[in-house]
């Protein structure tokens, strides 16, 4: 049972980390579209100096 809860906790932490990266509540600065392709999934465009991550 302890192993099950440990796995659940690891999955919860990983999913929160993935949500933070994909959802990016933080503004991601960029100079070109290539910068965004490295910082955000899905190759979003660079608009007004920030990546359009969704």
From Swiss-Prot:
PTM notes: Contains 3 disulfide bridges.
Source species: Olivierus martensii
Protein name: Potassium channel toxin alpha-KTx 14.3
Record keywords, A-Z: Disulfide bond, Ion channel impairing toxin, Neurotoxin, Potassium channel impairing toxin, Secreted, Signal, Toxin
Tissue spec. comment: Expressed by the venom gland.
Function: Potential blocker of potassium channels.
GO MF entries: potassium channel regulator activity; toxin activity
Domain statement: Has the structural arrangement of an alpha-helix connected to antiparallel beta-sheets by disulfide bonds (CS-alpha/beta).
Chief localization: secreted
Keyword presence, Chloroplast: no
Disulfide-linked positions: none
GO CC terms, sorted: extracellular region
Signal sequence extent: 1-23
Family assignment from sequence similarity: Belongs to the short scorpion toxin superfamily. Potassium channel inhibitor family. Alpha-KTx 14 subfamily.
Top-level lineage group: Eukaryota
Localization, UniProt: Secreted
InterPro entries for the chain: Scorpion_toxin-like_sf
């Amino acid at each position: 049972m302890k192993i099950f809860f440990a796995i659940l906790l690891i999955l919860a932490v990983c999913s929160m980390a993935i949500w933070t990266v994909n959802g990016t509540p933080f503004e991601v600065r960029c100079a070109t579209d290539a910068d965004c392709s490295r910082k955000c999934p899905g190759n979003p465009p660079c608009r007004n100096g920030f990546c359009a991550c969704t």
